[in-house]
């Protein structure tokens, strides 16, 4: 029997992958229905007009349009999707 543990294999060296969270579509980017705009843990960003929120707090687009971020009193940040037809008339 060996009196020393053989070197060469480590019992450490494992780690999990990052969760790939964050903003996926930034302000003034075009989106189509179902596009993921933000992946997050908790509600750092809140759903606004024409967007939905999944059960894991993912914010996604409900219509085709342009992403818009807006801040409200209290520091809340809302995410909206504005239809392109509204932007072309301005």
Swiss-Prot record:
Residues 1-20 are annotated as: Disordered. GO terms for molecular function: structural constituent of ribosome. SUPFAM superfamilies: Ribosomal L27 protein-like (SSF110324). InterPro entries: Ribosomal_bL27, Ribosomal_bL27_CS. Keywords: Ribonucleoprotein, Ribosomal protein. GO terms for cellular component: ribonucleoprotein complex; ribosome. GO terms for biological process: translation. It comes from the Bacteria. Residues 1-13 have a biased composition (Low complexity). Belongs to the bacterial ribosomal protein bL27 family. This is Large ribosomal subunit protein bL27.
